[in-house]
Amino acid sequence: MAAGSASSLGGGAWPGSEAGDFLARYRQVSNKLKKRFLRKPNVAEAGEQFAQLARELRAQECLPYAAWCQLAVARCQQALFHGPGEALALTEAARLFLRQECDARQRLGCPAAYGEPLQAAASALGAAVRLHLELGQPAAAAALCLELAAALRAVGQPAAAAGHFQRAAQLHLPLMPLAALQALGDAASCQLLARDYTGALALFTRMQRLAREHGGHPVQQLELLPQPPSGPQPPLSGPQPRPVLGSTLPLPQPPDHAPGSVAPSPGTLGAFADVLVRCEVSRVLLLLLLQPPPAKLLPEHAQTLEKYSWEAFDGHGQDTSGQLPEELFLLLQSLVMAAQEKDTEGIKKLQVEMWPLLTAEQNHLLHLVLQETISPSGQGV
């Protein structure tokens, strides 16, 4: 191409000569894919030429045209029944569309072409995800879901991003539960950005349940298994001596640290414990914000609020399923009491004390709780 075609292509206005140059090359390669009598089209060669044209257009910042060339590469790879190559070309096309959208928003402050590049990117990445799943690569599929979700969140579409974060969590859960919990946490944050507080509460509740299921310490489970006796093993042939009972049982431990106990501190891994703390605090704040009527209060939400009532206070500040530090638990308990009594001044004082203990997201929820207490809407938020 001529050197001046870069600016004209990047700006979206094509004089006839530059347009003819690109279109002539594109049509020339496309003609090689047409079926002719007694001649088989050379699909591999056409795919390589489309890829070369895409690289040239990308170097000239002609992003949408480079993306369309990558889609042509994907069609060639599909004709060759090469799934990995097709997925790679679709992913590259989607990234070019996303880059076009981000550049347009930075320069113009509005979506490019009424958001069509964003829709094209979502479609291409969705096809790539399906291909990776067909190839038995759920981790790669989840990574693409996370990439699309992060892009949607960056361009101001948190509601759409939340769905892709949840799909990534679903793909990660069987093999990487901690990554799945992180994706669910991102989805919950997107729900909060979209002001879908009911959906965020449901996600935090699900996260808490999954963290308890997958966060058990493996050492505790191993302690419950019989231990082989020390020393040389007897030969396999002949009668085997019966092992002594004392050699197969774990050593006695204090009641608070017995194997299989429900005490969370030694039994939950640190990362999962952090997830439990975040979910517990966020769920309490969301329940205070939404103020669901008793008829619509789910049992798990009712149990959460009951833990912070004075009647359930057991002298240690929390039950055995909690992970909160005692100071934070007592402050949350006071906050629940103040919110139930509509004590605005008490909530303001607690907000000052709780501010350094909460995340920015949780502090925003606490601010919304205070605003709802000052100016109640009658229906939560």
UniProtKB/Swiss-Prot annotation:
Disulfide bonds: none annotated. The keyword tRNA processing does not apply. GO terms for cellular component: cytoplasm; early endosome; nuclear body; nucleus. One of its GO terms (biological process) is vesicle cytoskeletal trafficking. Residues 226-242 have a biased composition (Pro residues). The modification N-acetylalanine is found at A2. It comes from Mus musculus. It comes from the Eukaryota. A motif (Nuclear localization signal) lies at residues 34-36. Interacts with HTT (via C-terminus). Interacts with RAB5A. Found in a complex with F8A1/F8A2/F8A3, HTT and RAB5A; mediates the recruitment of HTT by RAB5A onto early endosomes. Residues 221-265 are annotated as: Disordered. Keywords: Acetylation, Cytoplasm, Endosome, Nucleus. This is 40-kDa huntingtin-associated protein. InterPro entries: F8A, TPR-like_helical_dom_sf. Produced abundantly in a wide variety of cell types. RAB5A effector molecule that is involved in vesicular trafficking of early endosomes. Mediates the recruitment of HTT by RAB5A onto early endosomes. The HTT-F8A1/F8A2/F8A3-RAB5A complex stimulates early endosomal interaction with actin filaments and inhibits interaction with microtubules, leading to the reduction of endosome motility. It is found in: Cytoplasm; Nucleus; Early endosome; Nucleus, Nuclear body. The keyword Acetylation applies.
